[in-house]
Amino acid sequence: MENVRREATRPSVPSGTLELYFPDHLYRNDYVSLEGPRWAPAIKQAVRWKFTPMGRDAAGQVWFTGLTNSEPGDAWYKLPRALDTPYREAHTRWHGCFQSRQRGLPPAYTQHLREMAFWDPAITAQYLNSGPRWGCMQWRDRQIRGKEFVVTRNQFGAKLPWRSDYVPLLSLPQRPRFTAQDFRQRGLQRPCPAIGQPPPAFTPAL
């Protein structure tokens, strides 16, 4: 708890308190801060890893974190039974941190905050099936169709240099023909980028 008080007095959250490197060491249950609309405090992930030989996949193991003391499947970020009882100490403390700020806001703003920040305390939950997760989202390493064109938009139609020193958006762009900007001939008619031919001449009808 000393770390929590020390981090709460700082004006900004240092990057060392955020969970940048996964997994953290096993015996740490300090509060951390997640970047979000309300900077909600959370607890380290409940899923730890068993001791496995190096080079093997670690099997997920559910550890008791004190968030729920009756039913392990009951998530701690759901509505508690009563805010004045220590049924869920972590959720009650998280809810009380921002209760004073919400009193000075109009009701529409407080409802908007609740709708936007419902995911703040959601960390790696106690799922029965195996699979890495980041927060409450399933981690997928496969590409999403359509997203790869955003990164390499300036290289459309050209061969990508699949070299070890190639970095997207940092290496020299491989632009297709007729797409390089020429400021000296900006006013002239440029050929069509798709077919590489000049546009048809405009003949006004008399």
From Swiss-Prot:
Q: Which PANTHER family does the annotation name? A: HYPOTHETICAL PROTEIN LOC690617, TEKTIN BUNDLE-INTERACTING PROTEIN 1
Alphabetically list the UniProt keywords.
Cell projection, Cilium, Cytoplasm, Cytoskeleton, Flagellum
Q: Which GO terms describe its cellular component?
A: axonemal A tubule inner sheath; axonemal microtubule; sperm flagellum
Q: What does this protein do?
A: Microtubule inner protein (MIP) part of the dynein-decorated doublet microtubules (DMTs) in cilia axoneme, which is required for motile cilia beating. Located at the center of the tektin bundle where may function to recruit tektins or stabilize the bundle.
Protein source organism = Mus musculus (Mouse)
InterPro entries registered for this protein in UniProt:
TKTI1
Cytoplasm listed as a keyword:
yes
Taxonomically, which superkingdom?
Eukaryota
Q: Does the keyword Cytoplasm apply?
A: yes
GO annotation terms (biological process): flagellated sperm motility
The entry's protein name is: Tektin bundle-interacting protein 1
Per UniProt, subcellular location reads as:
Cytoplasm, Cytoskeleton, Cilium axoneme; Cytoplasm, Cytoskeleton, Flagellum axoneme
Write out the transmembrane intervals: none
